[in-house]
């Protein structure tokens, strides 16, 4: 009796975001101050991800000039749609819970520099947000200080130039079981060769799992 491989006949879902990203994004972006994290984040929000409602949770959102582009965009979009498309949230206790999210639209929740705050909210969004059609991005300087539940539920990791060898080895040990450490260091050296360079690891796409930046496939 022939056994049919139904996985081979399953239709591929239409691409929702940039090719480097899965359709359901649970991403961590790490790198030291000034490495380029915020500029990449703005590009993801404004160019590379599809969303209808954005929740930006950042204690210093009112002090960062780089977020002015989002405030201007929100002002213009609000005039057209009659409602705000971006919520700027400075207190993590005011961030939406999973139950608050509208699963009928594309939600994006971003946590930027919230390491010193209560981590229950981002942990729950990383764990359950996909059931409410919600993508999530967590931006931080130190990978090992991010709560384990967030790291365990992450499916995209972006690592910027400037991290220390301890963090690099921790990333390799967790994410890159299919290559030895020397090869991983060679892979990361591409990020070190250019200003604001970074690597992207996507667990959901084995054919292009490792990228230099967003576009160049490694390996």
Predicted regions and their residues:
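An amphipathic, basic-hydrophobic helix/alpha-beta surface used to engage anionic
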Residues: 54
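Conserved P-loop NTPase motor cores
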Residues: 25-49, 59-67, 73-182
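A general structural signal for short secondary-structure junctions and capping/turn motifs
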Residues: 19-20, 45-48, 149-150, 188-193
